[in-house]
């Protein structure tokens, strides 16, 4: 799947077909603002791909983008992530196939789009 920013029902269909998709991590009143993120979490298919966050209780993910969007800008941070993703992680990217890759960026461009692209190519 080339475009991870699909309508909710198409992203769920993609997950059911074993493809990786991107979802938004943000919650309001305990529920995800992205219905696909909630569905994927309930189904045990959500993988958090971001930094540690004390306020939300998220632990640092091995899939995080180490380059700051705030400091470098989105395009530069994504370019650096794409260019420097290590071979060890590239070898493990197959474990993301059929998972909802969760980050705070969605629906904006995100490093998870690249991870989904790699996973879906496996």
Give the ranges of each region predicted by the language model.
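Catalytic phosphate/metal-binding cores of nucleic-acid and nucleotide-processing enzymes, i.e., regions
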Residues: 2-122
